Amino acid sequence: MHQLIRKFVFTESHCLEEEDNTKSFAELFEKLDVNKDGKVDVSELKTGLAAMGFSMGKGEAQKIVTSGDTDKDEGLDFEEFSKYLKEHEKKLRLTFKSLDKNEDGRVDAKEIQQSLKDLGINLSDKDAEKILHSIDVDGTMTLDWNEWREHFLFNPAEDLQQIIRYWKKSTVLDIGDSLTIPDEFTEEEKTTGMWWKQLAAGGVAGAVSRTGTAPLDRMKVFMQVHSSKTNKISLVNGFKQMIKEGGVASLWRGNGVNVIKIAPETAIKFMAYEQYKKLLSKDGGKVQSHERFMAGSLAGATAQTAIYPMEVMKTRLTLRKTGQYSGMFDCAKKILRKEGVKAFYKGYVPNILGIIPYAGIDLAVYETLKNTWLSHYAKDTANPGVLVLLGCGTISSTCGQLASYPLALIRTRMQAMASMEGSEQVSMSKLVKKIMQKEGFFGLYRGILPNFMKVIPAVSISYVVYEYMRSGLGISK
């Protein structure tokens, strides 16, 4: 892999002499400095390495130049270039040594697996072998120092934590539902405080995303509650009815409480997840995949239990008529006075039951898509790139929604029934029977169209805002 880079930078010796090292860097620098102005800029670095067969991810060339550019002239002169490579090489050697558990000078799949486990990331044997295969040059299924250095010399990742972030499942993609397994943070991220910055960035991204797709979310709830075989509501007619009743601004009814509940739910879920992992683990806090899934599901149930009254208010505010409630507190006051405390937990059972199929299918589909990508395309790099990660996350979340949607519909109808005049208060099982008898199986999927329509814009908005927030909060890639 990358034969020209090996020719310029690497020798057969594991310990390059300082003068040989400098000479190799000088030859590489001359090759990259196409316009011969004595410095290598982002464009030259990217183009030159691509010509040598070294593919770089988005923004990696810029990050290398920014890291090494001490005089801030938007380019690396030879001194800056060689200094960056030498310092980066030292960091890579430390990482390699931390991986090489038995100190035999080679890293195998088991050592990669163990190192990631030490950082709180569980990896299957198959996944570890695939990542190893993507770096292994000589086909021995072990890595020596030269192979490791060759693969990561022009990758701005400086330590194992950054390298493993390629495939860490992130919950930044907010598609409006909160049933996912919480995000996983390494020990370094927890001790440096990076975790709260990532949660804050994700929270802001979710708020903007939900606001941007609120009209479609209101349409989904509207169709879940009011649409039936005898009262078919199309997207166009539904929007016309809502605008006629309350104006364009009415399309955002219920969005305020939907955004406000992000902060407490995220905080409770994260704290509960950490505690459940400790309770379920048998070996000093290191949890297996099934334990992680259980901890995530329990954390989701805990968070939902704590903020569920806000879920009920969101549904009521979304469906309200003009003048019915003056705001969130007025809504809470009227529900409490007319229906009592129990009303704040209507639909709680189907909501909790929906966590298992949603989270389980979300994780299973994500892992399947990830393994498919690794087995077919991870020949030169284990880095999937932004589009692949977004695609995997979107598809897996959508599949999870599809599986749990009937329970979500039952929950919404139970939340709304008490506020609808003349509606009969029934249990979850009776409501399912009633829908099946009157509308058939597809009656459980009323409102699925606007729900799916909001997935792509929601994911896109989440990602763009999250990246801006990462930059603003100084979160490293």
From Swiss-Prot:
Biological processes per GO annotation: adenine nucleotide transport; ADP transport; ATP transport; cellular response to calcium ion; mitochondrial ATP transmembrane transport
Segments of this protein annotated with the region Regulatory N-terminal domain: 1-174
Catalytic reactions of this protein: Mg(2+)(out) + phosphate(in) + ATP(out) = Mg(2+)(in) + phosphate(out) + ATP(in); ADP(out) + phosphate(in) + H(+)(out) = ADP(in) + phosphate(out) + H(+)(in); AMP(out) + phosphate(in) = AMP(in) + phosphate(out); phosphate(in) + ATP(out) + 2 H(+)(out) = phosphate(out) + ATP(in) + 2 H(+)(in)
SMART domains for this protein: EFh
Gene Ontology terms: cellular component: membrane; mitochondrial inner membrane; mitochondrion
Binding site for Ca(2+) 4: D136, D138, T140, T142, E147
Keywords: Antiport, Calcium, Membrane, Metal-binding, Mitochondrion, Mitochondrion inner membrane, Repeat, Transmembrane, Transmembrane helix, Transport
Keyword presence, Transcription: no
Subcellular location: Mitochondrion inner membrane
MF term (GO), any: ATP:phosphate antiporter activity
Topology term for the membrane: Multi-pass membrane protein
Residues binding Ca(2+) 2, per UniProt: D69, D71, D73, E80
Stated regulation of activity: Activated by an increase in cytosolic calcium levels that induce a conformational change of the N-terminal regulatory domain, uncapping the channel and allowing transport. Inhibited by bathophenanthroline, mersalyl, p-hydroxymercuribenzoate, bromcresol purple and tannic acid.
Database matches in Gene3D superfamilies: EF-hand, Mitochondrial carrier domain
Solcar repeats: 193-279, 287-372, 384-472
Chain segments carrying region Linker region: 160-169
Ranges for region C-terminal transmembrane transporter domain: 175-477
Principal location listed in the UniProt entry: mitochondrion
Domain remark from Swiss-Prot or TrEMBL: The regulatory N-terminal domain/NTD formed of two pairs of fused calcium-binding EF-hands, binds calcium in the mitochondrial intermembrane space and regulates the antiporter activity of the transmembrane domain/TMD. In absence of calcium, the apo form of the N-terminal domain is intrinsically disordered and binds to the transmembrane domain, inhibiting the transporter activity. Binding of calcium leads to a major conformational change and abolishes the interaction with the transmembrane domain and the inhibition of the transporter activity. The C-terminal mitochondrial carrier domain/transmembrane domain/TMD bears the transmembrane transporter activity.
Its biological purpose: Electroneutral antiporter that mediates the transport of adenyl nucleotides through the inner mitochondrial membrane. Originally identified as an ATP-magnesium/inorganic phosphate antiporter, it also acts as a broad specificity adenyl nucleotide antiporter. By regulating the mitochondrial matrix adenyl nucleotide pool could adapt to changing cellular energetic demands and indirectly regulate adenyl nucleotide-dependent metabolic pathways.
Family recorded in the similarity comment: Belongs to the mitochondrial carrier (TC 2.A.29) family.
Annotated protein name in UniProt: Mitochondrial adenyl nucleotide antiporter SLC25A24
Organism: Danio rerio
Gene field: slc25a24
